[in-house]
Amino acid sequence: MSKRITKTSAIHDKHSIITRDTESGFEYDSDSESDVENVFPNIRVQRIRDKLYQDEDEDEDEQVDDEDEEDEEDKEDEEDDADNFENENEEEVDDYIDGDGMRNFDMGESIEVGDVDSTSERKNGKIKKLTSRQLQKEQKRIKRTGVCYLSRIPPYMKPATLRSILSRFGKIDRLFLKPEDSAIYHKRVKYGGNKKKNFTEGWVEFVNKKDAKMCASTLNANKLGGRKTSYYYDDVINMKYLSGFKWFDLTQQIAKENEVRQAKLSLELSQQQKLNKTFVNNVEKSKLVSTIQRKRKERDPEHESDSHIRRSFKQRKVTSTRADADEELKARAQPDRKLSDVLSKVF
C-alpha cells in the first residue's frame, strides 16, 4: 500500500528538499522521491526528459569545446610550421622525392604500384621540398633496405599470396612481378588452358636487408611448405639476394627499357611513313604518265608506238671474289692497276 503524500511545511532541515508538483500542486519531501514517482508518474517522465535534455546540452558543450581545442591546435601547428620555414637556415634540396610509382608493384592487382613517399608532405595540392635533414633520413631508410630477385614464381600465384608468404621473414615494402607474354597467355586460353594470370619473374624489397638475406637463404630452391592441403605446398621458388642493389636501380632499368622500346617504335613508324610516302608518289606518277599517254593517243593515233615512254636505269656491274665465280666477275673485282702502282710508290 503506497503511502499518502501530504502537504509539508516549508520548514525542513538541510538534508531534505521541498519539491512541488506543478500539475497537482502538492509539495513533497525529496527523501520520498520513489513513492512520489509511483503515485505521480508524470513527475518521473518530466525528470527523465529534463535529464535527457541536460545530457544533450552537456554533450553539445563538450563537442564545441573539443572543436575549439582542435582549431586552436591546428592554428598553433600552422604557426609553428611557418616559423620553422622562416627560421630554417639550412640549404633546401631542390630535388623531389620521386613518388612510389612502383610501390607495391603487384602486377596482378593493377600494379599497386602509386603512392607518394611518406617523407614528402602535401600542402595545397603541391609536394613540399625536403630539407637536408629529411633527405638524410630518407637516405638512411633506403640504405637499410634489401632487394631480392625471384627467377621463378610458382604457377598462377597471386601477388597477395606471395606477399603473405614472404612477410613471415620481415616487413615488405614493395613487390614487382612481371607478367607473362600476352601471346603465350592468349594461346593457352585459346586451347582451353588455365585463364589465371601467370608471372615469370619478380623483385621484392624488404625494409631490413637482414630479413632479405634470411628469406633468400631459406626459401631458395626449397619447398614453400605450410599446410599440406595448400595449393603451393610442393612448389619451389628461386630467390637471390642482390647485394648493393636498390629499388631505384630497378626503376631506372625499366625506364631505360621503355625508352629503348619507344625509340624502336618511333624508328619503325618513320620508316613506314617513308614507304607510304614513296608509294603515294609512285601512284601519282603512274596516273600522270597514263594521262599523258591517253592525250597523245587522242591527238595522234598513228604514232601510238612512239607514245610509249622509255625509262633508263643505271645498272651496276656484278663482281665477286668467290673461288667458283666466273673469271669475268673476278677480273672486275680486282683493284685498278694504276691505283695500285701509285699506292706502291707512296708507301
UniProtKB/Swiss-Prot annotation:
This is Pre-rRNA-processing protein ESF2. Residues 1-101, 290-347 are annotated as: Disordered. Residues 310-319 have a biased composition (Basic residues). GO terms for molecular function: RNA binding. Residues 146-236 form the RRM domain. Keywords: Nucleus, Ribosome biogenesis, RNA-binding, rRNA processing. One of its GO terms (cellular component) is nucleolus. GO terms for biological process: endonucleolytic cleavage in 5'-ETS of tricistronic rRNA transcript (SSU-rRNA, 5.8S rRNA, LSU-rRNA); endonucleolytic cleavage in ITS1 to separate SSU-rRNA from 5.8S rRNA and LSU-rRNA from tricistronic rRNA transcript (SSU-rRNA, 5.8S rRNA, LSU-rRNA); endonucleolytic cleavage to generate mature 5'-end of SSU-rRNA from (SSU-rRNA, 5.8S rRNA, LSU-rRNA); small-subunit processome assembly. Involved in the small subunit (SSU) processome assembly and function, and in the 18S rRNA synthesis. Required for the early cleavages at sites A0, A1 and A2. Its main location: nucleus. Residues 24-36, 55-98 have a biased composition (Acidic residues). It comes from the Eukaryota. The keyword Nucleus applies. SUPFAM superfamilies: RNA-binding domain, RBD. Residues 10-23, 298-309, 328-340 have a biased composition (Basic and acidic residues).
